[in-house]
Amino acid sequence: YAQEVEKGLKDRFETLDAIAQLNQIKVLNAMQKHQIAEMHLGGTTGYGYNDSGREAVEALYADVFGTEDALVRPQITCGTHALGLALSANLRPGDEILAISGKPYDTLEEVIGIRESKGSLKEYGITYAQVDLLEDGSFDLEGIKNAINDKTKLIHIQRSKGYATRPTLSVDVIGEAIAFVKEINKDLIVMVDNCYGEFVEEKEPSEVGADMIVGSLIKNPGGGLAPI
């Protein structure tokens, strides 16, 4: 029975293998372009000037993910920390976050202030609003349009379904939502929580209009980086 099931999934496995190979080539090409060498692999605290390893890996990540720049350093301890950093760096008192893929991960609730927490964005006068996905897992475009207001500064999209039962969002679907949002206000910052999403498709949200993508080295890009 198991062999029959595996045969039935042959086409799907071949598609996944092709995506993996394409992304592997993308990473290898970037490593060659930035001349990643043994000198970049030495131990470091991540502090100080002229940290060639840090500078090289950040240039590598920016190239692979098609972004202007990247922050990849040991001071960022986890995905939630990275998300909190991205939010706090781009929001000021009076601004509003609009989450258009429903409630974010539980770990982000205290960062935003959905659950009361000292030092939350809410404590600093940054408000939060949310538009849930429709029953079929698609974006509620009418709801998004109605929710965007003069205070809206940053659009939050969570690619992975996390602990919910909704479908995970594809890059193309995210791109359509970003285009819709930018038509309403081109100055809105769109941040995609890309945790679990790296390298599972041929392109990343940064290639379809996302202003920031945030991930975690404990997940897909980390590979063998995280010690057990």
Please provide the spans of the model-predicted regions.
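Conserved PLP-enzyme active-site core in the AAT-like
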Residues: 1-6, 10-12, 27-28, 32-33, ...
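Acidic, PIN/NYN-like endoribonuclease modules and their adjacent C-terminal/linker elements
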Residues: 19-24
